Amino acid sequence: MSDYREELKNKETLRLREIQRELPPFVQAFFRGIAQTTSTKTRLAYAYDLRIFFRYLYEEHRTLGGIEPKDLTAAHLSEVTSEDIDCFMEYLSYYIRPDYENPAYGKEMHNEEKGKSRKLAAVRMLFKYLYKKKIISADPASLVDTPKIHEKAIVRLDVN
């Protein structure tokens, strides 16, 4: 492996560990569990997406609201329903994300179908892993439909 790729992988690994500190402790086991079958980039993308999901639970969930993400337990996820995940998908249309470099400011975020699908994939993987390991008794994420991705029109260049 080239030095550049090795250096990039090391940076991504350190960034992943940094983000995991903001997430519930059981998420670390999830990342260890998928490490053999996913790339560092995939795990990092999942970490970003799960951070948004847990921030949503903190800000919006009817019973988990107000519980810091790093204080959540796997038992708390038993309170999450497929309807909650549907609401999360709607939340992704527009939300204000904290600026992690400068916490006093927020950044407006919008997600179209592709962004929502990617975030749903991360949530599904987490619930699937926890269900498979018998940490939770149900997998509500599997009941949520993936957003339909609309095809972009093919733009052809004309010869002048």
List the model feature ranges, each with a label:
Residues 27-41, 51-153:
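N-terminal core-binding DNA-recognition domain of tyrosine recombinases/integrases
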Residues 1-44, 59:
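N-terminal DNA-binding module of tyrosine recombinases/phage integrases
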Residues 158:
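Short, conserved phosphate/pyrophosphate- and ester-handling motifs at nucleotide-, phospho-/glycolipid
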